[in-house]
Amino acid sequence: MKIELFYNPGCPICPKAKKLVKKLLRKYPQVEYVELNAFEHQDRVIQLGFQAVPAIVIDGALWHVGIPDKKALKKKIIGTLG
């Protein structure tokens, strides 16, 4: 399982989203986690079709834009990992 978090350096809420995801993923070390600057990866942003950050992509599919709900993200991780 791979989680990508797209952010922009000037985004005021991105640090909160990063912190939430990283804290949750401490319980799931088998999950690959990558943070990507949306400006530097505009091809992926266009491909995935989002226009705001933070954006969370799980296994190549856009899952959420904005600060994620911790319980919903945990449920998604558990459901994906099986």
Language-model regions, residue ranges each:
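Generic recognition of short, well-ordered alpha-helical segments
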Residues: 15-19, 47-48, 68
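Local sequence-structure signature of Cys/Sec-based thiol-disulfide redox active-site neighborhoods
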Residues: 1-23, 27
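Short alpha-helical
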Residues: 12-13, 40, 72
